[in-house]
């Protein structure tokens, strides 16, 4: 393990941030496209699960969630959070993703 001088690194970062805010330093920036809000319908969730011919319990276990949560998503009683929607969309577009998840 390397010995880092965290205080020096933090001090340097603060100086750079101050210089940047004063227009004296141009920091490297990245532009990220706004992907918008991801949505998924209950029918889509059911369709994804049925695409793999899996029971609710097995599919939920692979997604690292409870079967009750998956049931609520499928019946529209609750809405999956952004991470869950992203994972479901990824599995929908790239079915091999599910086998990679199963290896975790």
Swiss-Prot record:
Gene3D superfamilies in UniProt: lambda repressor-like DNA-binding domains
UniProt keyword annotation of Transcription present: yes
Annotation: DNA-binding region: 56-75
Domain HTH cro/C1-type, first and last residues per copy: 45-98
GO molecular function ontology, one term from the record: DNA binding
Record keyword Transcription regulation present: yes
Known role: Antitoxin component of a type II toxin-antitoxin (TA) system that counteracts the effect of the HigB-2 toxin. Binds to its own promoter and regulates transcription of the higB-2/higA-2 operon.
Leftover remarks: HigB-2/HigA-2 has been shown to stabilize plasmids very efficiently in E.coli.
Highest taxon, organism lineage: Bacteria
Record protein name field: Antitoxin HigA-2
Species assigned in the record: Vibrio cholerae serotype O1 (strain ATCC 39315 / El Tor Inaba N16961)
Pfam families named among the record's database cross-references: MqsA_antitoxin
Keywords: DNA-binding, Toxin-antitoxin system, Transcription, Transcription regulation
Induction data: Induced by amino acid starvation and the protein synthesis inhibitor chloramphenicol.
